Amino acid sequence: CSDFENYTLCQSIYATFNIFAVAPLILINVLDPKKHVKASVSKTYTVEGGKIVIDEEGILMDQLNIANEGGTTTYKADEDYVASFTSDGTVTVSIVKTGAAKSEKSLKASFVQLDPSAVTYEDVIGSIDMATKKKTGLELVNMVYPKYGYVPSLLLAPGWSHVPAVALALDAKASSISSLFTGKVVMDVDS
């Protein structure tokens, strides 16, 4: 991932593995595919070389539907077509030669995309649902040690820690990790 502006965790992934070559790295992803999405889109694509290319990023594969151009026949994934991500995050839909879509010249793709701009600082800070005990965002920091056996030594929220509320939440979490440890916070510089 090289879209550091929209997918801020990619900054940490890149720095950890490509610049400093250290591990492990534990990430808390707050981009929720049930909550942070754009409205459904339908577009028609020309079949070229037995495939179509959906030149959009952030497509949720479980919500990708392929139909004939008129939208009257919906084709089956892995039977009539195979969809896969490319290295740049777009999607290629290959038509199965023995599938029902084999003679189509154009296909209609309907899909839902992630919307990173819908993430808020409240999502990053997170919460605890008292009814279900489900934790989100920075509230998950205390789960890292018991679940994985690693003590989070550096806490950061790339693209978010310049927000005062996020900075305070990071400081609070770093001061007592699993009631046993402390960590340090790496803050963004607001430019």
Regions found by a protein language model. Give the residues of each.
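Surface-exposed assembly/interface segments
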Residues: 1-191
